[in-house]
Amino acid sequence: MGVKLLAIAWGLAEATVFFIVPDVLLTYLALKDPRRAAKACLWVLVGSLVGGTAMFCWGNYDLKGTEEFLTQIPAIDEELLNKVEQQIDDDGVKATFFGPIAGRPYKIYAAYAGAKDISFPSFLLVSIPARLLRFILLTWITWWVASKLLTKLQTRKKAFVLTAVWIAFYSWYFAIM
């Protein structure tokens, strides 16, 4: 029950206020138990969709307030908001699929989808593969690397390697954003 609630909460938090992706949790779970990690992907998706729904509604109701809130989150600034808004204007709901793959926060796409009167069912349907694809892919890659390339390392050492990877990733991400 603990992992399920943590996965839902992290998915919800990252889709609204938090800036560390739930993939961190999922990849650590994948080191020990890929099936448990795969199930957690679904629970993260549930939380993410709830959070995306909240941001969609807030963007529809009060885009200015949503934008002010979003710019208080690390790595989100007005320039990024403008890029996402333009992408939503140009590509509609498809932007919700491709944007987060490019490293742009889903929460921004959700807010602008609501503000730009994209249909909620379309937004939700696109959100499912947009979120789940990355969760499952990173979980699978982590499991594969840990079980095929790092076979001689103990789980604790694999976790250390994974920690180093996440620290390097976020150091790079915050440097470019």
List each model region and its residues:
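Hydrophobic alpha-helical membrane segments of integral membrane proteins
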Residues: G2-W43, E85-K148, W172-A175
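Membrane-interfacial segments
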Residues: L29, D33, D62-P74, V145, ...
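Membrane helix-loop-helix hairpins that form the core translocation module of multi-pass transporters
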Residues: A38-N82, Q86, D90-K94
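Membrane-interfacial entry segments at the cytosolic side of transmembrane helices
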Residues: K39-L42, K152-L162
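Hydrophobic transmembrane alpha-helix bundles
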Residues: C41, N60-G65, E78-L80, R134-W144, ...
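Final/C-terminal transmembrane alpha-helix of multipass membrane proteins
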Residues: K158-M177
